[in-house]
């Protein structure tokens, strides 16, 4: 497999940009929860939101004039990934570039507004301005139009693992000689409705922080943002292997799939970027790591950045790539002291490979391995 990361873009609750966000993670910074409320109920929740000003330099494209938050996040991350790639590998022909967009919950804010009008005033009140933003592929459509991509553009809908499955699809696309590049973008927006749903599923906690790898899961905090990687045949970081994993219908099956993925991707020189988020995922990942790679250094970005669902796996890939590039990993925040895992120290890491484990909350598990 000759698949490399040529450029990356990052829009997070800690800011925008690969180096600025990475520097904050290395310093031990973490996002601050903001209160989310809604007129339909008195209950409030906490979520990690994108800071004001993070999107201030987006181009004044007509497509973004009325675009939803998720579309704007995706556009910012995608454009940043392209800009970084151009600075490292040179000019990029967008006519030979495909686009794969990964999403989980989609444009919830505009969808809620659209159906609220319908329920309140009848079908005749349905807004033709809001409807285009309610479909899952709206961000991909906007980004393709901004970049001038007239060919292959796909949207994958899944859970927290969908970003890795999007990279697998991009790898398949790049086997076609018609493409030299594939831009993979994952994005999510936070809303009260999502918080309420995850709360009802007993996956959400009322206040930060996210506490990973504790013996009794304590819940997660939702976040929003986007991550993007431009895949090409040139670049510093190489994707050695992608494991599309599998689906689980029962939580007790998660550990079995994670162990198989780790077994297939195992490398004694690899660190692990986990998807631990304060839910059942943590214990499943811990058990698999203890069995397959017990000495590996383990880091998870979600205590600092939150659970961004559709964007989360791309964020993990960016963290893994940065760890290989800088030879450092941030501190593992709020982790259980008796977790039985090896967490990063302030010293440089000697890892030359990085394994990304991504376990979603709705039945999907996947993984990949990077090297430099």
For each feature predicted by the language model, list its residue ranges.
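Short beta->alpha junction loops
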Residues: 155-160
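Alpha-to-beta junction loops
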Residues: 178-180
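Internal active-site segments that recognize and position negatively charged phosphoryl groups
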Residues: 169
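Conserved "HGTGT" condensation-loop signature of ketosynthase/thiolase-family condensing enzymes
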Residues: 1-152, 164, 172-176, 187, ...
């Amino acid at each position: 497999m000759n698949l490399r990361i040529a450029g990356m873009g990052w829009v997070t609750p800690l800011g925008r940009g690969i180096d600025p966000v990475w520097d904050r993670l290395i310093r031990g910074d973490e996002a601050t929860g903001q209160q989310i409320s809604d007129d339909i109920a008195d209950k409030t929740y906490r979520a990690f939101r994108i800071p004001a000003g993070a999107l201030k330099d987006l181009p004044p494209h007509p497509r973004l004039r009325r675009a939803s938050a998720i579309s704007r996040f995706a556009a910012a991350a995608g454009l940043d990934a392209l800009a970084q790639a151009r600075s490292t590998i040179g000019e990029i022909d967008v006519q030979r570039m495909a686009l794969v967009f990964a999403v989980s919950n989609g444009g919830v804010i505009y969808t809620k507004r659209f159906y609220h009008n319908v329920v309140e005033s009848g079908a005749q009140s349905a807004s033709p301005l809001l409807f285009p933003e309610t479909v899952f592929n709206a961000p991909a459509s906007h980004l393709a139009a901004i970049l001038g991509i007239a060919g292959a553009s796909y949207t994958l809908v899944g859970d927290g693992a969908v970003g890795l499955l999007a990279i697998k699809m991009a790898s398949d696309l790049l086997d076609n000689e018609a493409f030299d590049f594939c831009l993979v973008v994952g994005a999510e927006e936070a809303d009260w409705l999502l918080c309420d749903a995850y709360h009802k599923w007993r996956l959400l906690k009322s206040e930060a922080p996210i506490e990973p790898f504790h013996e009794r899961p304590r819940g997660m905090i939702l976040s929003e943002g986007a991550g993007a990687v431009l895949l090409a045949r040139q670049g510093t970081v190489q994707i050695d292997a992608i494991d599309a994993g599998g689906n689980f219908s029962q939580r007790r099956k998660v550990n079995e799939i994670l162990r198989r993925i780790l077994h297939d991707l195992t490398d004694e020189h690899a660190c692990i970027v986990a998807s631990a988020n304060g839910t059942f995922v943590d214990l499943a990942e811990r058990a698999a790591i203890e069995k397959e790679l017990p000495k590996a250094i383990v880091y998870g970005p979600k205590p600092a950045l939150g659970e961004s669902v559709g964007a989360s796996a791309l964020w993990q890939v960016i963290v893994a790539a940065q760890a290989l590039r800088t030879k450092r990993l941030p501190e593992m925040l709020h982790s259980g002291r008796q977790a039985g895992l090896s967490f990063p120290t302030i010293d440089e890491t000697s890892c030359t490979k990085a394994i990304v484990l991504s376990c979603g909350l709705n039945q999907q598990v996947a993984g990949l391995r990077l090297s430099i």
